[in-house]
């Protein structure tokens, strides 16, 4: 009988440690193996096994002396390439005869012919190196090279194969533009080199001709020396004809390329810009330029060409920069740097950005509110809307220092990156992004603004009798009043204008405590449909309703427009027929105070995103997100300030320190609707009294508090327009504005937010503002809530609008934001981005409260 020790001896050692196996557990063959952890390993990207850290652009050449070699990388940081073998990869991408171009003596031709072959585009991959590349082959011309050609290629190298394949069309388009720019500069340099070589050959021919004549005179016509000189002269003559034919070919290239579709597209994509220095030229300057050009052309000294040239491997080949014109070469590098930045990052991010741009381009009706304007938007705007007739034309490239045979040589690539001119509709207003101070007020021109008038036709006050003025003083109170600023006359006299048609209901008296200027009357030609809706002789003690074709939800909406005519001056107005209260008003108060404009020279300013002549970028707005995040955490009344900006109420930031004021402006400008490409609706620093037209133009103003006569006038303007603006005193940490009760802005600006990065908070703001814009778009174009059922029943329109906004989930205060955005969308839809129509100036008869920390 076998005992227990023998049984134990025949058992396996592992059987004693077996635990119970769960039958419901996942089998091993279906389990995912763990990722092998390494120092810089990333399981979510294919660059983990590549020898370079991020994508880059490689420019290589197939040199006839040393073979394929890398020339430069973009970016030029050696850390980007890492241990990646550039020489090996250059050999891979340059080892194929990709174009099979023929340059030599074709059949039936005595001279070499330049074949302008098209670029080739291929995709190569090296799984061993973990690199995939989009390769763009091109040919440049060099007079000293074999066959006059120098093969080059530009490659976008990435570790993500899907990025190369899915973005092939975009890469091909961008690299084609860079290649065309590089080849245009090369053709220009090649033509210059041909001209110089022709001068050398002609000089050599003249020298050889003289020497040949001397040999004939001394040794006879059949001497050895004379025969050698004659053969050498014949070779020079042949070379001259060949170089002239090459020059003819290279200069006739653009005329053929202009018929190509790609060339036309490349030419059309250039913005119509022109250097400001080219506008104002006089005959003397042009004469000097002509003399200078002629001196440059004659500055080259011809050289004698030796009979035997250097060997192929003894001569020095030109570098890529020497093969091209300097300006074209630098422009090509800028384009390639832009390509590298645009395709940088993950494929998902690039694809999402492209979808975003495509969607934004289709939503131009609302994208102007909070989205950054792009170059393609400018191009679209220039096609859809009118362009000023005085725009300068695009200058043709002037190749100074070139022979006369190159005068017809043109190209589709502009030489310089010229800054866009500050034109109407294209750039910022004259004073929108520049700082306005009173430092050089004595040298500035004085501007005198008139009072408010109607936008209709104007004639003298004699058509209105004084009795009708006094009797019907309160008659014809309309639910909406239109105010316009008359244009400046030569004598700068102010006027009160009267409408064309006489009516008993065209004169409205405004309460001195709540009228726009507290200084005059508003004359309006009443509408026919409202002729029977005039009020009685009662004092205005309640807020008026809105006009029929206006927005009834807005309590009062004034439209400021420029009138081409001037009305009656104050000297012609008989104030005895007016009421006693109006007669006591100082006449000087009717005139807007003179503004003195100058460029501030203060050097101790804080960093501001507003730079004159440059567009605001998304990067600057992301930086402003950090300032906005800090603002809502430091100021408890941040929601009230943001509510004023979103509802169209001008916010004035008052302070002594310019740096503090600019920081607050920088924190709040991302909440301003219709900011503009250049920040036209924001004035970061103002040291003069602002006017009513400034409130119409600027929605965020940084105002200087100064202890001076200018400071007292600034405080006077604040008190004068205090009912129509909100004032944030950064010195006393107070805010005077109407109250806000709602939940929309509490989600937008919550001081308890867990967001810590400014860029993240900017994306949060952008998302919520986009949602708000979508609701405003829906409110604007839902026609059934704006069209009245009956012309006499306007209450139904107001109730339908109110119910519609309530269904969207907005309170009364939040509805004001939707209505203001809706008005901006209407104006943009009618007038376009050219901003032909003036924006509306709206305010509410509500009480302002003082908020303190």
Curated annotation (Swiss-Prot):
Domain cDENN FLCN/SMCR8-type: residue ranges: 316-753
UniProt-annotated stretches for the region Disordered: 272-298, 418-454
dDENN FLCN/SMCR8-type domain residues: 762-826
Signal peptide coordinates: none
Disulfide bonds: none
Record's subcellular location: Cytoplasm; Nucleus
GO biological processes: autophagy
Keywords recorded for this protein, A-Z: Autophagy, Cytoplasm, Guanine-nucleotide releasing factor, Nucleus
GO cellular component: cytoplasm; guanyl-nucleotide exchange factor complex; nucleus
GO MF entry, a single one: GTPase activator activity
Domain uDENN FLCN/SMCR8-type: 47-219
Compositional bias annotation for Low complexity: 421-432
Bias (Polar residues): 280-298, 433-454
InterPro entries: FLCN/SMCR8_DENN, Folliculin/SMCR8_longin
Record-stated family: Belongs to the SMCR8 family.
Subunit structure and binding partners: Component of the C9orf72-SMCR8 complex. The C9orf72-SMCR8 complex associates with the ATG1/ULK1 kinase complex.
Protein function: Component of the C9orf72-SMCR8 complex, a complex that has guanine nucleotide exchange factor (GEF) activity and regulates autophagy. In the complex, C9orf72 and SMCR8 probably constitute the catalytic subunits that promote the exchange of GDP to GTP, converting inactive GDP-bound RAB8A and RAB39B into their active GTP-bound form, thereby promoting autophagosome maturation. The C9orf72-SMCR8 complex also acts as a negative regulator of autophagy initiation by interacting with the ATG1/ULK1 kinase complex and inhibiting its protein kinase activity.
Protein name according to UniProt: Guanine nucleotide exchange protein smcr8a
Source species: Danio rerio (Zebrafish)
Upper lineage: Eukaryota, Metazoa, Chordata, Craniata, Vertebrata
